[in-house]
Amino acid sequence: MPRETATEKLIRMTEIERSLLADEGVSSIAGIDEVGRGPLAGPVVTACVSIPLSRLVLGVDDSKKLSEKKREALYPLLLENAEYARTSWMEPSVIDEINILSATKRAMEECAAGFTGGMILVDAVDGLKLPVPHRSIIRGDALCYMIAAASVVAKVERDRYMIQLAEEYPQYGFERNKGYGTAEHIRAIREYGPCPAHRMSFIKHFL
C-alpha cells in the first residue's frame, strides 16, 4: 500500500473540520489539546488553536508521532498562520490541590476563553465550560487537524520549559525525560528527594 502523502494526510485530517464548516455553517473551528497529564513533574499545558483552512500548514500530526525537530519547525508556522492561538499552564501546586483532571479542564477553559469562532473540537475531555459549542473527539489529536495543531503547540512550549527547568534542577534529567517517570527520574527522586517542580500527589509512593 503506497505511503500517504503530506497532502493526502492534510485532506484526511481536516475531514471533520471541513464537514462542520460546510454542513453546519460554523464560521471557524479551533482545537484544544493537552500535554503533560502523566508526568511526575512540571505543569500540564493546554493549547487552543484555530487556523483558517486556506492557511493550513503541511506536516501537522499528533505531537507524539512527530520528532522534536519536526515539532520545533512546525511551531512558528502554526503561530504565524493561526487566527487564534493561546496556551494555559497549571503548575504542580494546582495539580496537587485540585487533581490532574480538574487542572486540565481549568487550563482548557482558560486557553479557549478568548475564542469567538464557531466551534471547538476537544481531544477526549467532557464537561468543559467553553465560550462556544464544542465536541469531544476520541483520539482527536490523530484525527483532527486543529487538535493536532494544538498538541504540537502545547508540546513544544512544555518541552522547552522542562529543558530550562533542568538547568535549575540538573539532578533529575528533565531535559531528557520531560518530567515523566523514567527509571532515571525515579532513582533521582529517591536519592535527592523532590524539588518544587514535582507533583507531590504523583510521587508520594516513591518517597
Report each predicted region and the residues it spans.
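RNase H-like, Mg2+-dependent phosphodiesterase core
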Residues: M1-L207
